[in-house]
Structures are given as structure tokens and as C-alpha cells.
Amino acid sequence: MSAVPDAFQRYGAESLAQAPAFGPGKDGVFEATLARTGDRDTRLLRDYTKVPYHLTGTLDTDPAPGLTTLCLQEPTGGVAQGDRHSITVTAREGARARVTTQSATKVHSMQANYAHLDATLEAGPDAHLEYVPGPTIVNEDARCLQTVAVDLAPSATVVVADVFVPGGLSAHEPFDFDHYHSRLEARCEERLVCADAVDLHPADGDPRDPATVADYDVVGTLYVLAPEADTEVLAEAIHARFDAHDAVTAGVSALPYESGVSVRVLGTRSADVTDAVRDAWDASRQELLGVGIPADRRY
């Protein structure tokens, strides 16, 4: 599991009136190992789930040859205070896989403690692994820590998408959550190639200042980790897609050591930001796999 920032360590010391942190139903675990032989389909070799996570099986609906989809289900209706959920996915040599969720993740209002959503992604030589969950909706007074750790081989590719939506867009004032922190760290052969964070704590500073999200509400991020790809070509292909998205402001940055690109999208509507992130994902797919993304049929 990724390191926990000091602020969230202090939150974690707060007692809960209901089930404690890591208690029954609050310690969600999902583990999966995938492998592929030659040009055959990618197979799920091993999986383990612990409530509230559930996996019905794999889906073979992706247009990319040999790529299998894991749609992770969570029937509890959202994430509550004290929840600690972790995902670990390993794609062995040559495997191709996409991990998604059945819907958005709703982080409910809190009175104490915090919720932690942690993901560890490992991609072996020539593997292609995508982690593209639904948006994260953070409600009033909620504290949410999201951490993603990536370890990939030089010939592997890993794509990670994230869309943050403040719950105030529907019922109350935007940015009235307590604390939201999302961080990704990626390593290739033990070298740190990407370290990025979105840390929003309205009590310490207005998220709408010009140096943060300005007049926007929704934050979308896409990481395309591809050490052997042409970073300049990849960035240009993604950037060209944003010409068709007038409702958002977006940018593309090259990662250190020519290990890929990161994309940030800002908007006022979650649908606009999600569409732009999906378009950027599609552009990266075309460059890396020669085929576009699948239709969004999770619902």
C-alpha cells in the first residue's frame, strides 16, 4: 500500500462510532493476475475479492486483440468514513487488460476519520494495462485519499484515468468536502518516472485560486506511461483531440525520461471532462495499439 500523508494519518487516529477502520465490510480487497500466451486472449490466472468488491468474470468485448476487461463491482452504494479499499493488478509478459468499475465511486459525507482508495498496478515486458474507473464523487465534509502505484517494464504500457467531481455540483456548494488528495507514483526499473498529486483542502486555501482549478469544478487526469513510445508523437496526437472540446481547458505534458505523457482536463460539467479524457485515451490507444477504445457499456 502507498504511503499515507501526515494529514491523513492524523485523520486515521480518530475513532468511529460505527465499525472501525479495516472492520468487516470496510476492508475491500481486489487482487488479479493476468497472463497471455502468444496471440491468444489474455487469461485471468488468479483473482481474490473481499467485500465490498466483487468480480463476476472477464469480458471479451474490447476491440484490441487479446485484451480482456475486468469490471469491478461494489454493491454497497459508495465509500464511507473508515473505509480502506485496495486493488492490486498484475499483467504478466505480453498480457493486455483493462480494469474499470461498474459506475462512479461516491464518497459519502463524514464526521470522522477518512476513506482510502489504493491501487497497485504491475506490468511486465510487452504488457498493456489500463486502469480506467468511473469518476470519483466527493461529497460534503468527506475526506478521501486516492493513491496509485505503478511498476512497469520498459517495453510495457500502463494507462491510468481519473475524474474528480465535487459533490456540490448537485446538492450543495462545490468544494465543501473536507480534504481530497489523489497521488500517482510510477517507476520503471526502480526509476521514478512520474510523481503527480492533486491535493485540495478548502480550509487551507480556496481551490478556485488561479494556481489550482480557477473557475472550474471538475478535474480529469490521464497518465499514459509508455517508455518505448515516441513521446512527442503521443503528445501531439492527444493534444489534437482537444480542438473538438471547447467546454474544457486541457493540457498535455511529457513525463521525465521520455516515459510517456500526463494529461490534465478542467471543466464545469463532469460529462464534458469525462468525454475529453476518453478522447485522449482513445488517441493514446490508436498510437500504442492501433485501435480505439471500447464503447462505454458498463451501465
UniProtKB/Swiss-Prot annotation:
Domain of life per record: Archaea
Any single Gene Ontology cellular-component annotation: cytoplasm
Localization in the cell: Cytoplasm
Keywords of this entry: Chaperone, Cytoplasm, Nickel insertion
Main location: cytoplasm
Molecular function via GO: nickel cation binding
Signal peptide annotation: none
One matching Pfam family: UreD
HAMAP family attached to this UniProt entry: UreD
Summary of subunit composition and partner proteins: UreD, UreF and UreG form a complex that acts as a GTP-hydrolysis-dependent molecular chaperone, activating the urease apoprotein by helping to assemble the nickel containing metallocenter of UreC. The UreE protein probably delivers the nickel.
UniProt similarity note: Belongs to the UreD family.
Primary role: Required for maturation of urease via the functional incorporation of the urease nickel metallocenter.
Record's protein name: Urease accessory protein UreD
Source species taxonomy: Archaea, Methanobacteriati, Methanobacteriota, Stenosarchaea group, Halobacteria
